[in-house]
Amino acid sequence: MTTQQLPFPIPDDRAHYFVTCYADMHDLVEDLVVPDGVPEAAATVLRTARELLRQSYYCYEFSTVAVMHSLIAVEIVLRDRIPDAGKKPLHGLIKQGAADGILTARQAEYLDYGRQIRNGMAHGQTTHAVMPPAMAVPMVTTSFAIVSELCATPAG
């Protein structure tokens, strides 16, 4: 583990497994653009997830946090799109979204997989998990895509 020192952060030793320099991180996240029409609460969460991926050059674990964080944006939008969402957990929102045709079967499958990963980490079942950026970027991209698709459809 790299010890951070001021005045500049030091790249995580593992960063060089996937990029040669910090500037390469911009290419890694360049397609993660928040589209118009996304509620500001979800847009802020997606931008934060993107920046966590970018900063995983300095703290490798940020890529894992980015995946977990990006699911928050999906949950925000699902709550907005699903009638009577109330305080249902994400699992319930995914099931209802699929049943109501708000989510496709494929979207529901991806979200449920991400939810299981998130829950495993959040509830201590999966500890010391580090998701390399090569795995994290497609998962965060999926959250961006699902939010974009949900927001392209008028709320019911």
Model-assigned labels for residue ranges:
Residues 2-116:
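Amphipathic alpha-helical interface elements
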Residues 105-156:
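Charge-enriched, short contiguous segments at helix-coil
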